[in-house]
Structure formats: structure tokens, C-alpha cells
Amino acid sequence: MARSDPSAERFPAISVRQPAADLIVRGALRRDRRTRPTRFRGWMLVHASQGVRREEVARHRAALGLERDAAYEPERGKLVGMAWLEDCVADDKEWAYVWAKPKRFRVAVPCRGRYSIPFYVPASLVRGTPAEKVKAGKLEN
């Protein structure tokens, strides 16, 4: 089973559409449905892709901290936080990634996403974020 390596010069990431990316890093989405499985387990950066599922925004307004008529302009094309990928389980014809220990970044970090799971970003991109503490071994697993 693949695990994140805190001493590596790069950090694993996953690209997720909005609002799911925001929901994962807020701890409001614990199971994220995906079309393919992964053997990876451990800390992973959450990248907000360019896509936004507007119908999902309407369903999750409260979890996103939005007032009734407030506009939602999510971060796109940026690292918005990180979470621990705890498991990947079969869920009907899809897979569910099970997330834990979410950490939302105060400031989103611009980054290009990739389709591979995980994809890797330079550790230098996450300076000043909770991911830097993982790299230094100062954030619990």
C-alpha cells in the first residue's frame, strides 16, 4: 500500500471539483465517490479543479457556511487544504475515498491539477501551510 512520505521533496495531491474540495477540507464530506480505486493512504493535498458542480452547491449551502442567498465563488485551480486518505472502499459501481483529519489552508495556493491519483507537487509550494508540518513530522498521522 502506498503511503505519503513526509521527508520527500514533493507532496501527493488529488484534484477534486468544487464544492467537493471545499467540503472535504471543512470536514463536511467524509466519503468522496470516484470512478477508480487507489491504493494510496496518508496525507494528501486537496486541489480544487476548474470545474464547479452548481447543483451540488445548492445541496450543500449550510455545510459551505453560506447564507441563504449568498453567492458562492469557490477557489479554482488551487490547493485549498489537505486531508488524510484513510481508505478506499467499493460503493455500488464506483469507489468511495474515505477522508479524515481535514485541514483547510488559510490562503489557497495556485497549482495546476493532474488526472493521476495521486499527482505530486513540489514541497516548496506548501511552505507556511499545515502540509509543511507533515513534512517536518510535526503533525500527527
Model-derived segments and spans:
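Structured alpha/beta reader/binder surfaces that contact nucleic acids or chromatin modification marks
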Residues: 2-141
